[in-house]
């Protein structure tokens, strides 16, 4: 099935690209999320009429994400206190939700879905570099320090 992308989609294409995707991906994800429209003649004409508006909105979203990245990278290391046993092993773990809350408390709004932890949750005390995915083109790194709770 062919669709026209209304936003940049990671690993697929940019705004305005006409791409071929599987039917289920288009029907269940891209179209309901507002990321694409079916590539009919009518939709193509409508898209071309709105192209400048969509490009402006995409540029504004990118500028906002860049500003957030600058704030995040200027941030001091974020400290999270968690209960731990001997040798720095945590009782439980520190996950995306905990990190998002701590960074938000430090002064920059971050959602749980923006936190990337490819190695899974943190289970040891120590210093970690956590990547935040703010936009398809913008990533920021925040230093998180996990300490034992007193």
Curated annotation (Swiss-Prot):
Taxonomy, superkingdom: Bacteria
Matching InterPro entries: Ribosomal_bL9, Ribosomal_bL9/RNase_H1_N, Ribosomal_bL9_bac/chp, Ribosomal_bL9_C, Ribosomal_bL9_C_sf, Ribosomal_bL9_N, Ribosomal_bL9_N_sf
One GO process term, biological-process aspect: translation
Molecular function terms, GO-annotated: rRNA binding; structural constituent of ribosome
Keyword terms, alphabetized: Ribonucleoprotein, Ribosomal protein, RNA-binding, rRNA-binding
GO cellular component, one term: ribonucleoprotein complex
Function description: Binds to the 23S rRNA.
Family membership noted in the UniProt record: Belongs to the bacterial ribosomal protein bL9 family.
Name of the protein: Large ribosomal subunit protein bL9
Taxonomic source organism: Thioalkalivibrio sulfidiphilus (strain HL-EbGR7)
Lineage, uppermost ranks: Bacteria, Pseudomonadati, Pseudomonadota, Gammaproteobacteria, Chromatiales
């Amino acid at each position: 099935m062919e669709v026209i992308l209304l936003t940049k989609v990671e690993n697929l294409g940019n705004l305005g690209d006409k791409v071929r995707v599987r039917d289920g991906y288009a029907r269940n994800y891209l179209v309901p999320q507002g990321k694409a429209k079916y590539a009919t003649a009518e939709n193509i004409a409508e898209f071309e009429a709105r192209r400048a508006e969509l490009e402006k909105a995409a540029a504004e979203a990118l500028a906002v994400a860049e500003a957030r990245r600058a704030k995040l990278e200027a941030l001091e290391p974020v400290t999270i206190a968690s209960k731990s046993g001997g040798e720095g092993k945590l009782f439980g773990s520190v996950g995306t939700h905990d990190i998002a809350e701590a960074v938000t408390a430090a002064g920059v709004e971050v959602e749980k879905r923006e936190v990337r932890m490819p190695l899974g949750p943190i289970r040891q005390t120590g210093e970690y570099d956590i990547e935040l995915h703010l936009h398809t083109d913008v990533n920021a790194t925040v230093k998180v320090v996990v300490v034992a709770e007193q």
